[in-house]
């Protein structure tokens, strides 16, 4: 069985789930799977994927896992008590061949947000591992280890990068569970203090690493349906987050509606309240410069704020960003696929995104148009109008 612990997921799933329990327990949502890599035939592996998901739905949190979560300063006791009773229910997920007949598969997750939020990361990890164990029956781990050593060597070679730290954000697109663990341990041993930690809660617990994460796009997307007014949905999301965490976990995600809309909403109050912001699409250098100017315009010293970069990073790009912004702000870097799925094979570009909440379409209009995903073009047009966002030339939202 690929997934053997419900902690084998990203920390931000639990931080968002706690907000859902306390503020949106009645919300119903729908997620859909998409493979952005052309020409990939997943249909032959559909039974294996279903079997693995069935195994996932048999898991419960152990007392050791619950105690670990309880010790986190921002996790509340009633949430842990809820998790003690929790398991994923197979009735909320369907996995079928796409009617297009092109090798794609349809994965639909539909049900109460509180009971479906933990599906996304392990299901993506399952699809990845099932695909690669069938297509690469003798993985070239030697090549993977050599590539990983070169990355560690590159980052650790120059003294001026001694304070440049990276984190593992690679659970969802990892080559395999075994390889992911080896990567995390190799980074810990090879980078020392330059390895900030991991988004994976299971490996953080098992190997005493720092678990990292705050919020994901789905949280702010759901607020489109849960907030009082669509135009205020991003502000509403930030306010509800602050109401739950009272200044903790203060990294705001910036690209659900694009950078312009984010800066319009992220006013002086939020600049002072939140610790920083996370970049996940668009030009990271331009984004960073705009964030620093925005902080200065709102009477905040940028050197006290954190800029988190997490969009398709590799080590050379991390180093370039560090050189640009060092000493101007605090920095954090989350590296995903380039760490956990770089053995010389083409990684799958797969996602599971929320598309509806309480029966209403929800969408992400990021700074990288190809990352947008919504099944309702009329709603997308309305959302753009509300937030004053131009129609991108290469919009692929209906694909």
From Swiss-Prot:
Taxonomic superkingdom: Bacteria
CDD domains, sorted: PncB_like
Post-translational modification: Transiently phosphorylated on a His residue during the reaction cycle. Phosphorylation strongly increases the affinity for substrates and increases the rate of nicotinate D-ribonucleotide production. Dephosphorylation regenerates the low-affinity form of the enzyme, leading to product release.
Catalytic activity annotation: nicotinate + 5-phospho-alpha-D-ribose 1-diphosphate + ATP + H2O = nicotinate beta-D-ribonucleotide + ADP + phosphate + diphosphate
InterPro entries (alphabetical): N/Namide_PRibTrfase (IPR041525), NAPRTase_N (IPR040727), Nic_PRibTrfase (IPR006406), Nic_PRibTrfase-Fam (IPR007229), Nicotinate_pribotase-like_C (IPR036068)
GO process annotations (BP): NAD biosynthetic process via the salvage pathway
Pathway listed: Cofactor biosynthesis; NAD(+) biosynthesis; nicotinate D-ribonucleotide from nicotinate: step 1/1
Alphabetical UniProt keywords: Ligase, Phosphoprotein, Pyridine nucleotide biosynthesis
Residues modified to Phosphohistidine: 217
Molecular function as annotated in GO: nicotinate phosphoribosyltransferase activity
First-level EC class: ligase
EC number: 6.3.4.21
Family: Belongs to the NAPRTase family.
Protein purpose: Catalyzes the synthesis of beta-nicotinate D-ribonucleotide from nicotinate and 5-phospho-D-ribose 1-phosphate at the expense of ATP.
Alphabetized PANTHER family for the sequence: NICOTINATE PHOSPHORIBOSYLTRANSFERASE
HAMAP family: NAPRTase
Name of the molecule in the record: Nicotinate phosphoribosyltransferase
Organism: Burkholderia ambifaria (strain MC40-6)
Gene: pncB
